[in-house]
Structure formats: C-alpha cells, structure tokens
Amino acid sequence: MTVLGIMGGSGLYEIAGLKNAAWKRIHTPFGETSDEFLFGELEGQQVVFVPRHGRGHVHSPSSINYRANIDALKRVGVTDILSLSACGSLREDLPPGHFVVVDQFIDRTFAREKSFFGEGLVAHVSMAHPTCGRLADAVHACAREAKFPVKLGGKIGRAHV
C-alpha cells in the first residue's frame, strides 16, 4: 500500500480536508523533526504531512533537521514523498504563479549535516536521477487537469546559510 508523505514548504503548514486527522510527534535517532506530523486520509489515500519549516515558519532552511524528517517519514511507513517549495525563477517564461515539477536539484546549503552516513559507514548514493518519474508524471497530470500553469522538468537550487 502506498503512503504519501507531503513536505510543506513556506506557507503550507497543514492540509485541509484530511479525514481522521491527528498530529503526532515522531522520535528519531537524528533528533527532533521540524514539527509534529499530521496523519490522515485524503480521497482514500493515506497521507503523512510534515510542515518543513514548522507551523508558524520557525525554522530557516539551513536549520531544518532534514535527516530527522526523512527518517521519521520512513519510520511511519511513507513510500513516496511529495515536497513542495516556494521559490523564485531566473527565467522569464516561468513567472510567479507557475509550477515546476523538478527533476534535478543543486544543494549549496551549509552549516548542517547532509548525510545519513558518517564514521563507520561509508556509502555512495547516486543523485543522477533524484526524483521519481512516476510521481512527477502524476503531479504534472493533476496540475494540468486543474488548469494550473505547470512545466514538467526543471532544476531547483538551494543556497541558504
């Protein structure tokens, strides 16, 4: 069974319309998550929502404990993750209000742990294709059906201190 994890970016702190909605704290060996997680069901789909910046936007991008968030999603059985971000564009053909279903990212953040691996465990994880094509196609189709201006494929860059 698919369990959809949704990571909300700036301005998205809860999901309206969830049935059987309940906020729960998830503990991880990587420390505290951004906030409690919201569990529920949306149109028959089990959903687990995490407000990435915390409710009330209390965590800056470089202070978010991404490892704890991802580990917690895994611990509660999430199989797919949809991560939403608000950001600007450097392209005139993608003005404010347009959606981009990204297929690649550049992470230039620093001053935070970036890996689950460390002393005693070395691993190499390919980031050549960091997104799920099946999920990207589904999101793109839903956005088009809802008449949102959307582009399939693009890059997102993070460079927060």
Located regions from the model:
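Ordered hydrophobic segments in well-structured contexts
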Residues: 37, 156-157
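Polybasic "coupling" helices that flank or enter modular domains
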Residues: 128-133
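Glycine-rich ThDP/TPP pyrophosphate-binding loop and its adjacent helix/strand module
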Residues: 134, 138-141, 145-147
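Conserved small/polar residues in nucleotide/adenosyl-binding loops
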Residues: 159-161
